[in-house]
A protein has these predicted regions:
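A conserved acidic, glycine/proline-rich C-terminal tail/linker
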Residues: 239-261
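One-carbon transfer enzymes
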Residues: 1-221, 225, 255-291
Length: 291
């Protein structure tokens, strides 16, 4: 079976590094210009690489120019959506998505799953169509979200699942045994792209949501943050505190700074047990208010 791979980022690189020794060398790899490890991988393994946005006929023209034909396209953490012209030119295209579709369509689904307090996520192999993560499901694997998991630790779990799921898809595609199940759109949810500025903590949230918000975006992600006198405080870990306070105390108030800062929220308080910019802790004083 002739295979082409669309992939981006660290997760994509780790997966293709794992599978290259177990499948025939792909006919081509498509990636983005920032995925330097994947570009280097293509060069080292003498695989033709398309670099950039595939839309507007660019990848179609690349395949035609290089007389590349494939039986199956595998998309792994690929940065771009495919347009109709490209999809129509492919015999079969399967994407691996980091959620249990139809829930959490869209970007960084594992991060959103933690933020929303889910106890499980997963990886779904689905047919690529012209919409975002809406194609028929061919395989699905559940992944538990433990209470101390972060966005990074969930990706570590995905790294182990993706290769085996890909091998299974390839084997069943070769034998024409892939079973397609339509997604139930009535159960679908969608979450968009996140930026570093989206990490602002709202101290009016309950402590459970604040903890989930922080761990979902912990290092090496840009991080959840708050503002102390306009200066950004990036928080990588919080734990619940049983410190007492008055009901009239404003949410976001620093209650104590003896060991770690303890911050008031509506249903209790949280202790900032890991802050990325440690020097800023010297500026914390009791009764100051984080924004």
């Amino acid at each position: 079976m002739l295979i082409g791979i669309l992939t981006s980022g660290g997760l994509g690189y780790k997966v293709i590094s794992e599978i290259i020794n177990r499948i025939k060398k792909p006919e081509f790899i498509a990636t983005d210009s920032n995925s330097e490890q994947i570009i280097e991988f293509s060069n080292q393994n003498e695989v033709l690489a398309f670099i950039g946005n595939p839309r507007g006929g660019k990848l179609v023209d690349f395949l035609k120019k290089n007389e590349i034909e494939v039986d199956l396209i595998l998309s792994i953490n690929y940065l771009f959506l495919l347009d109709e012209e490209l999809i129509d030119s492919l015999p079969m295209a399967i994407n691996l998505h980091g959620s249990l579709l139809p829930k959490y369509r869209g970007r960084t689904p594992h991060v959103w799953s933690i933020i929303n307090g889910e106890t499980k996520t997963g990886v779904t192999a689905h047919v690529i169509d012209t919409n975002c993560d809406t194609g028929d499901v061919v395989k699905q694997v559940e992944v538990p979200i433990e209470k101390d998991d972060t966005g990074a630790t969930i990706l570590k779990k995905f790294e182990k699942i993706y290769p085996e799921l890909l091998f299974s898809v390839i084997e069943e595609a070769q034998s024409d045994d892939l079973k397609r199940v339509k997604q139930d759109n009535s159960k679908a949810t969608f979450f968009g792209k996140r930026t570093p500025d989206d990490g602002l903590i709202n101290w009016s949230w309950h402590k459970e949501r604040i903890r989930n918000w922080v761990r979902a975006q912990a290092n090496p992600y840009p991080g959840a943050f708050s503002l102390l006198n306009g200066e950004r405080v990036i928080v990588d870990e919080v734990n619940y505190s049983d410190i007492g306070f008055s009901d009239t105390t404003k949410n976001g108030t620093i209650l104590d700074v003896i060991e770690n800062p303890i911050i008031k929220c509506p249903n209790g308080a949280v202790e900032l047990t890991r802050v990325r910019n440690q020097d800023i802790l010297k500026k914390f004083k009791s009764k100051m208010v984080l924004k």
